[in-house]
Amino acid sequence: MLSVIGGGNMGSALVRGLLAGDFSAEQIAIVEKDGARVAELKNEFANVEVTSQTPDCDSVVLAVKPTDVVEVSRGLANSGVRQILSIAAGVKISKIESAIPGKVAVIRAMPNTPALIGQGASAMSASKNCNVENISWAKKILLGVGSVVEVEEELLDAVTGLSGSGPAYIFLLAEALIQAGVQQGLSEQISNELVRQLLVGSSLLLAESSETPEQLRKKVTSPNGTTAAGIAELIGKQFAEIIGGAVGAATARSKELGK
């Protein structure tokens, strides 16, 4: 039995991924305390057990708030759990291990919000107690909502700053582009429609191409052309340095929260 503790947006996204993969509804339980949310989960996942109490199980996904992880982990002491996947931001593996007596395999992961539509980018790190089977189990869950890479735990803060917070950077870019279109005379509706498709199309082109982002950029940047003028303005305003500063600030904050 696999218990997903926390039936919020990310927890329910993982359940959808599991059900779309090799897991059956009978193999999954969702643990959720909020009564209103329980009703919503029962409506969406008709054949999945939704409960306020964690059943005995050998596998757990921790999808609760970071501040609740230690308390929830302590409650798993007598549940028979042998492997845990935590997606709680900033909570170190050692903190989870110290809350549960015995030898438990703990994997810590950092997904991002596109996981809600099965297009997430996740990074994971395994504890010393993990074997190949534990790692494969965690990967299988995360692959249900997108892609996954393995990194050392100390790099998960950098992952948080880059891909964890990254969707917000992209959405801010979208806001700025829409506003720029309006400033040049387009209606907000037209500008919004163009920018949304711009981001979708460019992302798909990047994902499906064997070329680097730099190569793709240069292909659409003719010397002395319109794109070259726009790129020159971005470079002059230190666009790369601004992005680097944002990722650095988010990484630093992740480290602070993990102390």
Tell where the protein language model's regions lie, with residue ranges.
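Small-residue helix-packing motif on alpha-helices
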Residues: I28, V38, V69, I96, ...
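NAD(P)-dependent Rossmann-like dehydrogenase/reductase catalytic/cofactor-binding core
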Residues: R196-K259
